[in-house]
């Protein structure tokens, strides 16, 4: 009795609180799970069983009453209760509902067309489906397939970004207020951030979905796969269907017929070879021709020369135009100005020189055109028609494109027409150092301005302000362009109009013959410059997986693994008897020439940048110490030689010499990157590929004939004998002794025994003498 009285008193006390009274009088007191959840903090032992038990009740879930009424979901459908007008005890304005309520909303609720949103979210998957539809399947062959496991891209992307760069882009696109400080990538690609913001603005997508879309758009999804043949992303995404260990399914994948992708590939390769040729101080034009003719690309299953692809393509980008002019090709009446494509429509200008002052002191000349001309311009998604006369942009009409592209297109047109106050007095932030390249070549003032607007958004807007700001005519609202590139601005730029659709490029069947100057400037027969090396966009880190760069200067352009292998192969070929070969340089202790061999220089870009000085100090010390003591192995010297190019620097050494792709070699220890065996010192294995070490003296196909030489025999070691090369042996007299590098770099003493003597008859005797001299 006392227990019941205690409960009654507690109940009366709780009822003094309105919310508690409502819960105990209106709520489902019989619902054990509700009170169990509120009165215990222990972990559920069997959550799956508890969930099934809870869902077996009549109304296991809650729903927003207002949303149910707006969606016109009835309380009952086909004699099945969907929800009841009983307020839930745990959440205000929510009522109890059954699982059938969800089924009714899915099948009988209001229709919502989300097809466009779904296509946008899963764009990469739909793109893969479309590419599979384009595949041309051929015959199935049964044969042994030589597959190699490599890191490949399994998804084609328009622009490849690193994982950290994608995260920065996601933060700056979706969470501007919470984003960290701008990294170098954000500062250099802020236009991309604005483009992504405008792309996903006012779309019914939550931020998690947009983050997923951004990752799929820029992530090529690299994986380690056993591959064979061409390793283009379009082919790698279905490599499982193209072959196995004993069969090959012939097919033409979508990458072969994808004209835009092929054009981008050719453009990227041309950009690389142009920049490599420009880095050459002398004969840049001849170097460019050499690079083009020594390069080939794999198109599908076919290996084609880059020279043929350049002459066939209709691409008018500056890099392709430079390569085409180097080959003496023809082009339509087009020209390039930075990343902007231009095509003249009418008019013929006359060059006139004028002067602009840098920091108010130094006068710099630039050229402009005095007569009126009309042009078509194109930059990314924006197009334009404009007219120039004297030093002004008379008018311009911009079609299509996002705000950022329209702004940059207008800025480049202003610079091309020499429009604005900055062609009278240069911006204060432009210094004398901006007027020349690192090699000391002069940069024309218009390209100095192009570089200036790329440095910051403030510089770009400062140039646009120099165009002039006027009040927008109410009748032209929607067709005038504001300073931010928008259509509906209260104040707009002078003589700049916008139309919604793109402007079509005018066609021209007339072709012009191109020539290339030593400064890598393409010009036509009238002397008009149509493209220069300064028009090329900033170099991008691109790995060419299906391009063959045969020229030794371009070894670094291969994928890094192949470049390391080819670099070591080139060093091993220097194990000859020439004066400039590695054994001779070691004998003369000419370390400076050894560290600056062309093959060593070509491998220098493959070394980890932040450790190159420390690695150089360690590698040089290893080489000099071994040579000084006389106990060295040419194999080990070859291993560390690529790390000796840079100036030595003090620092902590962790025992391994790393390349930029995180692979490494370790002095005195074999690994997958570089290995060799004393049992068979005629081969060096680099990334599993056997490279034969050239034999300095004797038949390259006979390991037992290392010391055999026609007319000579091995004798006891005589340090007084002169060191000679193989080319000088013809001058050695009868009975004279000389020293020569043999085998893998060992020094042996030889004696002239006859003018002509068959080396094959002395095999056993000479080999025995070599062993005795050891």
Curated annotation (Swiss-Prot):
Q: Pfam family example for this protein?
A: Flu_PB2_6th
> Which molecular-function annotation in GO is an example for this chain?
RNA binding
Protein's GO biological process: 7-methylguanosine mRNA capping; cap snatching; DNA-templated transcription; symbiont-mediated suppression of host gene expression; symbiont-mediated suppression of host mRNA transcription via inhibition of RNA polymerase II activity; viral RNA genome replication
UniProt keyword terms in alphabetical order: Cap snatching, Eukaryotic host gene expression shutoff by virus, Eukaryotic host transcription shutoff by virus, Host gene expression shutoff by virus, Host nucleus, Host-virus interaction, Inhibition of host RNA polymerase II by virus, mRNA capping, mRNA processing, Viral transcription, Virion
Cross-referenced InterPro entries, in alphabetical order?
A: Flu_PB2_2nd (IPR049110), Flu_PB2_6th (IPR049114), Flu_PB2_C (IPR049115), Flu_PB2_CAP-bd (IPR048298), Flu_PB2_middle (IPR049111), Flu_PB2_N (IPR049106), INV_PB2 (IPR001591), PB2_helical (IPR049113)
What is the first-listed, main subcellular location in coarse terms?
A: virion
Q: How does it assemble?
A: Influenza RNA polymerase is composed of three subunits: PB1, PB2 and PA. Interacts (via N-terminus) with PB1 (via C-terminus). Interacts with nucleoprotein NP (via N-terminus). Interacts with host ANP32A (via C-terminus); this interaction promotes viral RNA synthesis.
Q: What is this protein called?
A: Polymerase basic protein 2
* Species this protein is from: Influenza C virus (strain C/Johannesburg/1/1966)
């Amino acid at each position: 009795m006392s227990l019941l009285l205690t409960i009654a008193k507690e109940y009366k006390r709780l009822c003094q609180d309105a919310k508690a009274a409502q819960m105990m009088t209106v709520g489902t007191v019989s619902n054990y799970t509700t009170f169990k959840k509120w009165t215990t903090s222990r972990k559920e032992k069997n959550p799956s069983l508890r969930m099934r038990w809870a869902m077996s009740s009549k109304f296991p879930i809650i729903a927003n009453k207002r949303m149910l009424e707006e969606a016109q979901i009835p309380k009952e459908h086909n004699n099945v209760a969907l929800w009841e007008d009983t307020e839930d005890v745990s959440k205000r304005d929510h009522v109890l509902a059954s699982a059938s309520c969800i089924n009714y909303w899915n099948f009988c609720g209001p229709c919502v067309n989300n097809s466009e949103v779904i296509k946008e979210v899963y764009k990469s998957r739909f793109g893969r489906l479309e590419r599979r539809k384009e595949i041309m399947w051929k015959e199935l062959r049964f044969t042994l397939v030589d597959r190699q496991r490599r890191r490949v891209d399994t998804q084609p992307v328009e622009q490849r970004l690193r994982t950290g760069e994608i995260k920065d882009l996601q933060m700056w696109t979706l969470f501007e207020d919470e984003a960290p400080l701008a990294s170098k990538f954000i500062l250099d690609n802020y236009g991309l951030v604005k483009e992504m913001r405008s792309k996903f603005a006012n779309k019914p997508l939550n931020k998690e979905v947009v983050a997923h879309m951004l990752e799929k758009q820029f992530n090529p999804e690299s994986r380690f796969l056993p591959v064979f043949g061409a390793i283009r992303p379009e082919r790698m995404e279905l490599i499982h269907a193209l072959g196995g260990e004993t069969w090959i399914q012939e097919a033409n994948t979508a990458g072969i017929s994808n004209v835009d992708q092929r054009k981008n590939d050719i453009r990227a390769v041309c950009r690389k070879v142009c920049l490599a040729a420009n880095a050459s101080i002398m004969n840049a034009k001849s170097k460019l021709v050499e690079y083009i003719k020594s390069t080939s690309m794999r198109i599908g299953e076919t290996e084609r020369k880059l020279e043929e692809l350049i002459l066939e393509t209709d691409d008018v980008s500056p890099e392709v135009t430079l390569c085409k002019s180097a080959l003496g090709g023809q082009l339509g009446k087009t020209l390039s100005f930075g990343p902007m494509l231009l095509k003249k429509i009418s008019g013929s200008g006359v060059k006139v020189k004028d002067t602009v002052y840098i920091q108010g002191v130094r006068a710099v000349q630039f050229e402009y055109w005095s007569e009126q001309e009309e042009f078509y311009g194109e930059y990314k998604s924006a197009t334009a028609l404009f007219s120039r006369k004297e030093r002004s942009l008379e008018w311009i009409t911009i079609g299509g494109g996002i705000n950022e592209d329209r702004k940059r297109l207008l800025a480049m047109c202003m610079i091309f027409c020499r429009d604005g106050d900055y062609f009278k007095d240069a911006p204060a932030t432009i210094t004398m150092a901006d007027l020349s390249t690192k090699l000391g070549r002069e940069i024309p003032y218009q390209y100095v301005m192009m570089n200036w607007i790329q440095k910051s958004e403030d510089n770009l807007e400062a140039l646009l302000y120099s165009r002039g700001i006027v009040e927008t005519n109410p009748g032209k609202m929607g067709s005038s362009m504001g300073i931010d590139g928008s259509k509906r601005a209260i104040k707009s730029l002078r003589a700049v109009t916008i139309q919604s659709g793109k402007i079509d490029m005018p066609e021209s069947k007339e072709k012009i013959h191109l020539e290339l100057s030593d400064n890598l400037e393409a010009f036509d027969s009238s002397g008009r410059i149509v493209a220069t090396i300064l028009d090329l966009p900033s170099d991008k880190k691109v790995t060419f997986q299906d391009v063959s760069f045969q020229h030794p200067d371009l070894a670094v352009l291969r994928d890094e693994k192949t470049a390391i292998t080819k670099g070591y192969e080139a060093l091993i070929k220097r194990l000859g008897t020439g004066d400039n070969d590695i054994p001779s340089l070691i004998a003369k202790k000419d370390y400076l020439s050894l560290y600056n061999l062309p093959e060593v220089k070509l491998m220098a870009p493959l070394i980890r940048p932040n450790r190159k000085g420390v690695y150089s100090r360690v590698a040089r010390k290893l080489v000099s110490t071994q040579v000084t003591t006389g106990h060295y192995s040419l194999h080990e010297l070859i291993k560390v030689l690529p790390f000796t190019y840079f100036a030595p620097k003090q620092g902590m050494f962790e025992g391994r010499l790393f390349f930029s792709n995180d692979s490494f070699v370790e002095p005195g220890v074999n690994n997958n990157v570089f290995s060799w065996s004393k049992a068979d010192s005629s081969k060096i294995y680099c990334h599993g590929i056997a490279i034969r070490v050239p034999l300095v003296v004797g038949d390259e196909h006979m390991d037992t004939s290392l010391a055999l030489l026609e007319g000579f025999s091995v004798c006891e070691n005589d340090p007084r004998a002169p060191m000679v090369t193989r080319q000088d042996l013809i001058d050695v007299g009868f009975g004279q002794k000389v020293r020569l590098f043999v085998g893998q770099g060992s020094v042996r003493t030889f004696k002239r025994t006859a003018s002509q003597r068959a080396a094959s008859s002395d095999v056993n005797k000479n080999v025995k003498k070599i062993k005795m001299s050891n």
